[in-house]
Amino acid sequence: MQRICVDMDEVMADTLAEHLRRYNQAFDEDVTTDDLAGKGLWEIAPLDRQAQLRAFLDAEDFFEVLDVIPDSQQVLESLSTRFEIFIATQAMVVPNSLGPKYRWLQRHFSFIPPTHYVFCGTKSILRADYLIDDQPRNLTRFEGQGLLYSAPHNLEVTGFVRVNDWLEVADYFARVVSESKAAI
C-alpha cells in the first residue's frame, strides 16, 4: 500500500486564520490573507511585533482551536481506504504544541490512528510515496512525489505539483489510482 504523509498546519488545520485573528485583535489591525499574497505574516509584521507573533503560537490553546481546512476530513478518510495516511507536523518548532496538536487530530481526524502521527523537527526524515505540504523547503528535501498545498505565502512558488484545495487532492489521487489500475 502506498503511503501519503500530510502536513497539518495550513493543510489540514487553518493555522493562518487563527494567527491572523489574534494578530488583528492584539494590534487593532485588519490584515487579510489577500495582504499576504506571496508573503508570510512574519514578513509583513513589524520587528517589534515578532515576539508577540511567536507568543500567539506558544499559547496553550492556539493549536486546539484551529478550524479544519474544508474537505480535508472527507478526502483523507476516503484516501485512507487505498493509501496509508500519516500526519507529519513539525511540532518540535513549537514544543508545547504537541499535546494540543494530538488532541486536535483525535477530535477532527479520529479515523487516523495515533501511531500514524509524526511529530518531528524536520520532514527530511520522512519516507513515503507522497507528501502534501504548504512549505516548499519540505518538498525540496522529500524523496517521493511532493504536492504543494496552496497557501498565501507560497502563491508565487513554482516547480512543484500544486493542489489548491482538498478537492484537487482527491482528483490527483483518483488519477494515481486510475493509472496504477491501467498499469496492471
What residue spans do the PLM features occupy?
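A structural signal for isolated positions on well-ordered beta-strands in alpha/beta enzyme cores
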Residues: 84-86, 130, 147
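Membrane-proximal envelope and lipid/glycan-remodeling enzymes
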Residues: 86-97, 156-167, 171-183
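Substrate-recognition "cap/lid" segment bordering the active-site pocket of phosphatases
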Residues: 88-141
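Short, basic/glycine-rich phosphate-binding loops at helix/coil junctions
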Residues: 44-59, 83-86
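Active-site neighborhood of HAD-like aspartate-dependent phosphohydrolases
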Residues: 1-52
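Acidic, Mg2+-coordinating phosphoryl-transfer loop and its flanking beta/alpha structural elements
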Residues: 132-167
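Substrate-recognition element of Asp-dependent hydrolases with the DxDx(T/V) motif
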Residues: 63-67, 72-101, 105
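Non-catalytic pre-domain segments flanking phosphatase-related domains
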Residues: 1-6, 178-184
